[in-house]
Amino acid sequence: MPNVSEYHRDVVLVWEHSTQWKSEMNHSSDFWDALASHHSAIENNYLDLPSLRRIIHDIHQPVLVVGAGQGLIVEALQKKGLHAEGVDLSAEMIRYAQKRRGLTLVRADARAIPFRDGAYETIIYATGVVDFIADDAQIQMILNEARRIVTQSGRIFVAFYRISASMEDLLIRLGLLRNNVMAFKEVLGLYGMNLVQTIAWAAGKADAGYLHATGLLLRSWAFSTTKEKLTALSMQRIFRKVADADSLINAAPEGQPYRNEGEIRNLFTRLATPISKLEATASCYIVEI
């Protein structure tokens, strides 16, 4: 792992010796492992490059990206001349980061990052980490770990995925977003349906006729963001190409949290963690704590 050892030669990979949460880590990474070979088509999403530009002047090296995926953000920071490293839960994502970008990322759980105290000036939690966790106690563990490995004057950024108001409204109407939890597995299954199947499915979920269901879908599509449209089309192509779509769906969690700005503020209030700044971009919220 040259990217890490060149800058921090005292790294100790304690996670290799912890069987309890290593087992949990393997289970949690199943979906990302299954998605890895298709991820290049959708990776510039949520905490994307335009969103990164919103905070770029507040980022100081060395930087650690947690949930680095296949290295999109790490590479972008390095191109800006910053010393940036990354960790991720998924072994397959890490393998593709090496294959596609020549990056050596470290496999680690965000709750126990294998670096010394005060090793970084900036910690960035990409989307797919904190925002995918429902349990406040687990999030608190992650934030405590960030405080440990960042310098006293350092900065911590936490990204939360964002959907458009029209998409949020559609998911609520179809019963796919309730009590701030998205029925992720069910949403994922929609990408494998053709248009007729989707309309029939929506009519059943909304307890409405086909014409009304068609109107709901068209209205949502019309007011969705360009990024949402492109992501949906990319996901449909992935499901047409994948050999076993069911395995990808089965690897996904049943549900995942969705937090709008108000819910994000409520989360940090419960955690007794003051928000220094909250940036709302087209595709994500970025919280500085």
Feature-to-residue mapping (PLM):
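Class I SAM-dependent methyltransferase SAM/SAH-binding core
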Residues: 70-112
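Short alpha-helix
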Residues: 253-271
